[in-house]
């Protein structure tokens, strides 16, 4: 059995690459000017045409195992958005990518991941408070 190992910056970079690949594929469907995507359904042997981000995300499987981990984690989170709200998969994926790209810059600069998480939690609370005011 062949096993792959990676750590540190290389691992973070690979995971973020996977998230970027997922987000690039899903982002094309975003909004009213989003485009249709043609996917090939392996089981049925027919093409599928869709503008639904969650459907596009379901088809994303990456060859690199570390990239695939990143894509699968974000895909699961985005599917929860679709399950709970009925929509928002594409937006959740694109926002997650933006947040994690910014976090990667701070990690590279030496900021503690725990401090980054605390900052994200504070920002989340502030956003929820503002939304409750509306």
Regions found by a protein language model. Name each.
Residues 1-134:
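N-terminal glycine-/lysine-enriched basic segments
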């Amino acid at each position: 059995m062949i096993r792959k190992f990676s750590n540190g910056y290389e691992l973070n970079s690979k995971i973020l690459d996977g998230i970027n690949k997922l987000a690039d594929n899903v982002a094309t469907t975003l909004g009213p000017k989003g485009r249709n995507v043609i996917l090939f359904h392996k089981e049925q042997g027919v093409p599928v045409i869709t503008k639904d981000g969650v459907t596009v995300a379901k088809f994303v499987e990456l060859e690199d195992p570390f990239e695939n981990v990143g894509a699968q984690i974000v895909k699961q989170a985005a599917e929860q958005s679709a399950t709970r709200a009925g929509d928002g998969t594409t937006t959740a994926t694109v926002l997650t990518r933006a947040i994690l790209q910014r976090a990667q810059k701070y990690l590279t600069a030496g900021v503690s991941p725990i401090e980054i998480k605390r900052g994200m939690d504070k920002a989340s609370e502030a956003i929820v408070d503002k939304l409750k005011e509306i």
